[in-house]
Amino acid sequence: MKNKITFISAALLSITSTFFLNSCKKNDNSTVATESIEDNANAETHFDMIFDEVDDAAVSGGVYSRGKTAVITIDTLASPRTMTINYGDSNMSCADGNLRRGKIVVTWTGRYRAIGTIITVTPVNFFQNDFKIEGTKTIENKGRNSAGNLEWTIGVTNGKVTTPTGEIHTWSSNRTRTWVNGESTRFILLDDKYFITGTSTGTNR
């Protein structure tokens, strides 16, 4: 059964924390709600993992450290700039322990990570651990907010995850991520904390 669900979130995210979402009331829809939350979290995680690959490749200038033999092509003359990460047609065992195949196409409108730059990430016939990932993720660097914290807007449109058994989950999301702790210790990740607000909507399995 497909069920549409909308999430409105406001959360403090720490990389040392684990989150559990619990319904306030137990009812006949509890199983559906649980599946929807799990599917949404799974979809967001897949795109976060994809962006980790993108970020590593872009920051290193194409000297790829996560994959073994992924072919990276960066066109700095194009407008916007374009990067393609090609894992090939067969599963590649990457350094982070995940299997990937297909391509990730990335564009960015200005200097990577600069204020105002918009990064767009699109998987093309892309599979991660045999889950097919579709859709487009857009990240805009908004600079510092009134409190002096770095802020980004992050959106996913036409997101779709197809499981190895053929189950499909679709979603779209719009979020704002604010870096509230850990900026001064760039190389110490354990103290990083982000405040995330926004909405997400989609259909579960």
Stretches with model-predicted labels:
Residues 1-2, 25:
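Short, Lys/Arg-rich N-terminal segment immediately upstream of the first membrane anchor
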Residues 2-9:
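Bacterial N-terminal signal peptides that target proteins for export
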Residues 9-10, 42:
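Residue-level detector of intrinsically disordered, flexible termini
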Residues 10-18:
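Bacterial N-terminal signal peptides
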Residues 19-23:
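C-terminal motif of bacterial Sec signal peptides marking the signal peptidase cleavage site
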Residues 25-205:
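Low-complexity, intrinsically disordered segments exposed to solvent
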